[in-house]
Structures are given as structure tokens and as C-alpha cells.
Amino acid sequence: MKRREFIRNTAAGLAALAAARPHSAKAENPKYKVAVIGRTGRGNYGHGLDVVWNNVEQAQVVAVADEDAKGRAAAAKRLNAPRAYADYRLMLEKERPEIVSVAPRWLDCHRDMVLACAESGCHVLLEKPMCQTLEQADEMVAALEKKNLKLAIAHQTRYSPTLQHARRLLMVLGTHVMDLMRLFAGDPQWCFARVRENGKPITRDDVRDGAEGIGPLAGDEIHVMYRFGEPTMGYFSTHRAKDGAAARFGLRLYGTKGVLTTTTGALPEVWFVEDPSWQPGRSKARWRRISSNGIDQPETRTDPGQSFGNRLIALDLIRAVETDTQPKGNVYDGRAALEMILAVYESHRLNAPASLPLKTRVHPLTLL
């Protein structure tokens, strides 16, 4: 090969490599350029997915986008963002951030915002749930995979130091066990569910548009059974809000040697009892607390405004970017959790167990 051809081909190869390489902090600028997308009045900024970056020293917020003028000005002030935009697409084009918080809580915008971020080559921190349908989720996964981009979804409990102790304990309790079920038990194989409204099975007439851009919704009573790997089963039941509903929300795991209960969040309340009968009232076995410091240790951490959990997610997203691995709660986990939810309606529609992954990618309620 001639010298001129060698130089030309080498330059072309380096250019292609640079284009394919995921964004990372440069030596001359160790801070990641972060942008925030919010939507005041229609999902706002989620559960603190904007201010989390104020507590991440490896990152610097360079801009915020919000279609609402007052909300935009307020966000720019609390984030110390030097620039603010009404159009998030224009912000992505002008600022070229490396990481973007897609913060609105409402789901009707998640798909479009994430696709725009992927097109601009940005990694994403996304408010949960992921989106409205599996069809949208598949599009998001494909767009991120195309450019080797990472997405972390704000399922805080996955990052909990408390649950790290709990997962180790499950081995002792003998457990071979929608996101927390998968965290402990893996992917479900099938789902069987019944959905009722006013005491009767739902029909097309019961389908309505859910609040906060959630998409189609139906039912005020849901009962679900999931089959995980042998011999593990999972059960989920819910009714329209009744007295004490918030206090009952959580997950309970039954193993051959005991029971573990947990709430959600980065610092959940976790208790376990070593009792093969699962009847501690009869056996007199004592419930024991698990904190982020371990078994029977007092909890010394706090999480005001969910800032502790959000920071864990943001730091793990940066770790994933730098190591070219997946975040603990990634785009595939977000899609799988959504699939478990939509499998409920698909099983009801079929009046039979629905195998997972679902073949139906549109919302099952639109097919009733």
C-alpha cells in the first residue's frame, strides 16, 4: 500500500471509530455534559430526575428544556443551567449533551423523547414507567442498541444497599426464587390474570384513557399469577384505593426456611423471619430488620426527596457508560417490567395464560 493510501485509510478508520464510540468524559473536560427535559404541568420533572445532577460531581447541567415558560425559568434556576429551551429537540441539536434526563412522569412523551436522545447520541436517565406499549418499548430498545447507548430507568429499589443484604439472605432462607419480582425471581414464563370493574369482568366498554398519559386503562380489581422458574410462583392483587392501601403496598417472599417482606425505594423497610411454617405468631419466631448496614443494624441513611436513590442511579449510569456495560436497571428491565403489566390485560383478553415474551406488542386493551 502506498503511503498516501495508508494515511487516507487510517484517517477514515479513526473517524469511523470515533463516530461509533459511546460518549465519555474527555480528559480535558472530566465532567459529563448533562441536559434535562421536563414538562411542567404534564409530568413535570418526575421524582427529582432534574436536581439529582446537582449532587453528581462528575456531571454538569448545561441546559434544560421545558415547553412551559415559567417552569423552564424555575428549572434553569434550581439547576444552575446556563441555557434553557422551549424545544427539547433544539436543545439536543445545539448543546449535544452526553447524558439526558428524560424526567416527565407522564408516559405519552417518553417514546418520542428517548428516540430523539438516541438520534443525538445521548445516554438517558428515564423516569418510570418506561412507556405506554411494548411496540414503543421495542422502538426505544432498537434505537439505543443501534448506537450502543445506555438507558437507566428510575427503579430505585434495584439500587438499594438494603436489598443487597436481603438478596444474600435469601440464599440462607432457601428461596430459589413487576420489577422487584424479576429482581428476585428472574423472568416470568407466563401470566394468568382476571381484571374486574364493579364486580364484573372488564369488556371494551370499560376501557378508558388513564391519567398522566398512561394510555388505555381498565378495571378496579386485578388478580394475577406469574410462573417463574420451577418451582417459583408470583402473585399480585390490587383493588381501587381502600383504607390502608398505601401501607400494604410491597412485596413478600416465601422460602423453605422463612419469609421476607420489603417496601420499595432506595431505602426500603425490609424484615425477615426464619420460620419454615410461615406462621411466626404460632412459632413465636421473631421478625428481624434489615437496614442498609445489615441485619439487626439501625438505619443511618436518609433519603429526602428520593435524592439518595436517584444519585445511585446516576452514578451507575456513568459507570455503565465508562465500562460499556448495562446499568443495574436498564432499558431491557424497563421493557420487561412493562411486559409483566401488559401481560395482565393480554391474559384477561385471551381468558387463558399468556406466554412471555408476549407476541402481542400493541396494547391488549385495544384488542378487546
Predicted feature residues:
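Contiguous beta-strand/loop segments that form the cofactor/metal-binding neighborhood of enzyme cores
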Residues: V172, H176-D275, R311-P327, A343-V344, ...
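Internal alpha/beta domain cores that form substrate/cofactor-binding pockets in large enzymes
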Residues: K33-A35, V61-D66, K70, L79-D87, ...
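C-terminal helix-rich "cap/oligomerization" subdomain common to oxidoreductases
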Residues: I7-N29, I99, T302, D316-L368
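N-terminal Rossmann-like dinucleotide-binding module
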Residues: G13-L79
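Twin-arginine (Tat) signal peptide motif
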Residues: M1-I7
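Beta-strand-loop-alpha-helix segment that lines the small-molecule cofactor/substrate pocket
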Residues: I99, R105, R111-Q156
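Active-site loop of classical SDR/Rossmann-like NAD(P)-dependent oxidoreductases
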Residues: K70, T302-A314
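Rossmann-like NAD(P)H-binding beta-loop-alpha module
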Residues: P161-L169
